[in-house]
């Protein structure tokens, strides 16, 4: 009976998501639903292959959480969970033999050799690049705080096209010692079915542009391409989600908004006060968003139109497959049945911060460490040291790539693959 259940669980895991490629990790958390799930399986134990330490660590847009919430009475206020911690590490994507990341400190997009960590090319923008690039059909899609979306060639790094949504008003203004555009691209770029989607702007009173461009040309050429200006709707910041018919956009210090994918028109906002922040995950008919509400840390589970279904207290990361929900807090990993909501296993952990599911292995990042657990029973399989808080995990083409808050990117793989190397930029 146990073997039968394991077999069924693995089958559900394999078919729960349509993968762009079993080996690649072409966008943040693998896909435009931000599942953080890949069918790739890494053979354990892993060994450090290379470690890249940049000249400058990340320069976050919001280094610390707000001091307090004005909407909560002084008697009820608690320490705030950071709602805008989307750029505290150099999150990476990886396709084939290449690794890509953007730098908020150097205003650049980088391409590294996946086997050695050596730089293949670098592209300079005029503002911080805060989100992981998206890779699609041999092209790199990224946005910058200079107010421009860029499409680059994956092989050479040469510019194919650029697009500035607020071009008629696109001036640079001071922000924490840097010059940024009021129309900064703070959504990442999501590419699907020949269209590139992103937002421009983060001041509600100035309005925010929602954009859908031809991914090949960077132009508004067909009916499904558009540019919509939304005034006083919110400050959209975080990684965009796509369903077949809708766009879901984290609201930063508010709850997510959702839009019609065909027209870009606003369809509504999730229930206010529940699950605010830059984290969002789409799984079947559920959206998980947070990691905070007005009472403290929580990930909110909601229907596709924002109707609240459940709250997951203190959870700061989640992975949801066909049958199981994996929840991470700073002190615990939990696996829960989606159907019965019964806890399958718990594991204590110190300073947990990120997860990725590769086959039947759950990788977990924490302070100065990355670990691997059996996803079925929670048994610890492997761990290794990393420099700093492991905030980003990518599994691609035989490697585990770890991004930390120091700016380091570390590649783990089979010890016999390539000699270990330290790369200093």
Can you say where each PLM-predicted feature lies in the sequence?
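Bacterial N-terminal signal peptides
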Residues: 7-18
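N-terminal secretory signal peptides that target proteins for export/translocation
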Residues: 1-5
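Aromatic (tryptophan-biased) beta-strands that constitute blades/sheets of beta-rich domains
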Residues: 23-93, 97-100, 108, 118-125, ...
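Repeat-blade elements of multi-bladed beta-propeller folds
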Residues: 25-29, 81-109, 123-150, 177-211, ...
